[in-house]
UniProtKB/Swiss-Prot annotation:
<dbReference type="InterPro" id="IPR006062">
    <property type="entry name" value="His_biosynth"/>
</dbReference>
<keyword id="KW-0028">Amino-acid biosynthesis</keyword>
<dbReference type="InterPro" id="IPR006063">
    <property type="entry name" value="HisA_bact_arch"/>
</dbReference>
<dbReference type="Pfam" id="PF00977">
    <property type="entry name" value="His_biosynth"/>
</dbReference>
<comment type="similarity">
    <text>Belongs to the HisA/HisF family.</text>
</comment>
<dbReference type="InterPro" id="IPR044524">
    <property type="entry name" value="Isoase_HisA-like"/>
</dbReference>
<dbReference type="GO" id="GO:0003949">
    <property type="term" value="F:1-(5-phosphoribosyl)-5-[(5-phosphoribosylamino)methylideneamino]imidazole-4-carboxamide isomerase activity"/>
</dbReference>
<dbReference type="GO" id="GO:0000105">
    <property type="term" value="P:L-histidine biosynthetic process"/>
</dbReference>
<dbReference type="GO" id="GO:0000162">
    <property type="term" value="P:L-tryptophan biosynthetic process"/>
</dbReference>
<keyword id="KW-0368">Histidine biosynthesis</keyword>
<feature type="active site" description="Proton acceptor">
    <location>
        <position position="8"/>
    </location>
</feature>
<keyword id="KW-0963">Cytoplasm</keyword>
<keyword id="KW-0413">Isomerase</keyword>
<dbReference type="GO" id="GO:0005737">
    <property type="term" value="C:cytoplasm"/>
</dbReference>
<feature type="active site" description="Proton donor">
    <location>
        <position position="131"/>
    </location>
</feature>
<dbReference type="InterPro" id="IPR011060">
    <property type="entry name" value="RibuloseP-bd_barrel"/>
</dbReference>
<dbReference type="InterPro" id="IPR013785">
    <property type="entry name" value="Aldolase_TIM"/>
</dbReference>
Length: 246
């Protein structure tokens, strides 16, 4: 079970949002590269970066901070990035800088042809982020709810050749209210590619519950507010996951 610390970038700083609201952000660090190093030192095997300004602007906005993170830890662990990635040139630029995975969210839903092209050009490097509320997919930094069912889109994108899917329950993100295990497992069981859980991770019980369903296809979990607030000790949680799932 991969526990993947999230580093959300806003104006070059590491922040956390509550339910995706840019106006409800807390700055946790003004040095994202040092933050990345600290998670690696605590045993992280992958990092999850989000360019928040980019997600809302539709183009990269925190590239300098991202490249500093990649220079600091990119040669040691896999790094994945989402937010504002809407064209092949941006993907190529980030992969050349040492990024392992690019996460495509809104653009995958609105422009499936772009996702197909990305999977063809950069096979093995493309992850889709599906954000949903009550089983329906949301786009545009969670501001728009679509009529698409998560499982239907998951199957479609799997056929395109995406590496894995990050499933975020946006009703729970940043609320420390517990992962929506049931919905995550439902998606994982419907697919043959791995699913990464996200949104609401709060404590060690969540980690243990996720380890119980790893064999259903749940590969990992994005760790956000809980590891920054101290509700979850990251190093202890990763050690527990390794103990449970070897």
């Amino acid at each position: 079970m991969l526990l993947i610390p999230a580093i959300d970038l806003k104006d070059g700083h590491c922040v956390r949002l509550k339910q995706g609201d840019m106006d409800q952000s807390t700055i946790f660090s003004e040095d994202p590269a040092a933050m990345a190093r600290s998670w690696v030192d605590k045993g992280a095997r992958r990092l999850h970066l989000v360019d928040l300004n980019g997600a809302f602007a539709g183009k990269p906005k925190n590239e300098a901070a991202i490249k500093k993170i990649l220079a600091e830890v990119g040669s040691e662990i896999d790094v994945q990035l989402g937010g504002g990635i809407r064209d092949l040139d941006t993907i190529e630029r980030y992969l050349d800088a040492g990024l392992r995975y690019v996460i495509i969210g809104t653009a995958a839903v609105k422009n499936p042809g772009f996702l197909q092209d990305a999977c063809t050009a950069f096979g093995g490097h493309i992850i889709v982020g599906l954000d949903a509320k009550d089983g329906k997919v949301a786009t545009d930094g969670w501001s728009k709810l679509t009529g698409h069912e998560v499982i239907d889109l998951g199957k479609k994108f799997q056929d395109y050749g995406v590496e894995s899917i990050i499933y975020t329950d946006i009703g729970r993100d940043g609320m420390l209210s517990g992962i929506n295990i049931e919905a995550t497992v439902r998606l994982a069981q419907a697919l043959t590619i791995p699913v990464i859980a996200s949104g609401g991770l709060s404590n060690m019980a969540d980690i243990e519950a996720l380890c119980d369903v790893e064999e259903e296809g749940v590969e990992g979990v994005i760790c956000g507010r809980s590891i920054y607030s101290g509700d979850l000790d990251f190093a202890a949680a990763q050690a527990r996951a390794d103990e449970l799932n070897g």
